[in-house]
Amino acid sequence: MTGSGTPSQGKKNKTVHVKCRRCGEKSYHVKKERCSSCGFGDSASRRGYAWQSKSGDN
């Protein structure tokens, strides 16, 4: 009966994120084919949210 505790964490050594073609961040998910930083592969517009900047800043 294998648990998901500390010994199992050592097996997590596969490459999940690689460098994104659009933003250059190491956030492009290989299996999902989507960048978690800029949204490349999922949307034509850049990923960004209002909560990422202080309220009132323009």
From Swiss-Prot:
Pfam families: Ribosomal_L37e. GO terms for cellular component: ribonucleoprotein complex; ribosome. InterPro entries: Ribosomal_eL37, Ribosomal_eL37/eL43, Ribosomal_eL37_CS, Ribosomal_zn-bd. One of its GO terms (biological process) is translation. The keyword Zinc-finger applies. Keywords: Metal-binding, Ribonucleoprotein, Ribosomal protein, RNA-binding, rRNA-binding, Zinc, Zinc-finger. Its cofactor is Zn(2+). GO terms for molecular function: rRNA binding; structural constituent of ribosome; zinc ion binding. A zinc finger (C4-type) spans 20-38. Binds 1 zinc ion per subunit. Zn(2+) binds at residues 20, 23, 35, 38. Residues 39-58 are annotated as: Disordered. It comes from the Archaea. HAMAP family: Ribosomal_eL37. Belongs to the eukaryotic ribosomal protein eL37 family. Binds to the 23S rRNA. This is Large ribosomal subunit protein eL37. It comes from Halorubrum lacusprofundi (strain ATCC 49239 / DSM 5036 / JCM 8891 / ACAM 34).
